Amino acid sequence: MKCPYCAYGESKVVDSRSTEDGSSIRRRRECLKCNRRYTTYEKIETTPILVIKKNMSREYFDRNKIVNGLMKACQKRPVSRKQIEQIADEVERHISNEMLTEVNTDKIGQIIMKNLKKIDEVSYVRFASVYRQFKDINTFMKEIKNLMDKN
């Protein structure tokens, strides 16, 4: 790696440690020519994941869409931002563990609903109403009845 100060191509690693979240490694390097220090980060290169939408179009996986959708469903409910992030983490972990390069929105929705149901039933029904595209109050009531029957 070239030194950002003098562009020399060789350096030595002075310090190396994992970042707080463990997703990358932070390295302090010292240039062997000018002796100046700089920091680099090493991260695993991931394959981009495509999401297959209901209309069969494809777009790149965007974690922010999951978080934003959950924020709306959990608005004014006792669900923390940390819990929302954990659900998004679970979706990413599931996709990663199955080594998928493409995933449909149904699969993502199922993972979200399974996890959200454990945290807050009202948020679950709110999310389900959008995800499953409830057309009328009867569909809404069926979902609530199913939820109540399982409890």
UniProtKB/Swiss-Prot annotation:
Binds 1 zinc ion. It comes from the Bacteria. GO terms for biological process: negative regulation of DNA-templated transcription. Residues 49-139 form the ATP-cone domain. It holds the Pfam family Zn_ribbon_NrdR. The keyword Transcription applies. InterPro entries: ATP-cone_dom, NrdR-like_N, RNR_NrdR-like. A zinc finger (unnamed) spans 3-34. Its cofactor is Zn(2+). The keyword Ribonucleoprotein does not apply. GO terms for molecular function: ATP binding; DNA binding; zinc ion binding. Keywords: ATP-binding, DNA-binding, Metal-binding, Nucleotide-binding, Repressor, Transcription, Transcription regulation, Zinc, Zinc-finger. Negatively regulates transcription of bacterial ribonucleotide reductase nrd genes and operons by binding to NrdR-boxes. HAMAP family: NrdR. Belongs to the NrdR family. This is Transcriptional repressor NrdR. It comes from Clostridium botulinum (strain Loch Maree / Type A3). The lineage of its organism: Bacteria, Bacillati, Bacillota, Clostridia, Eubacteriales. The gene is nrdR.
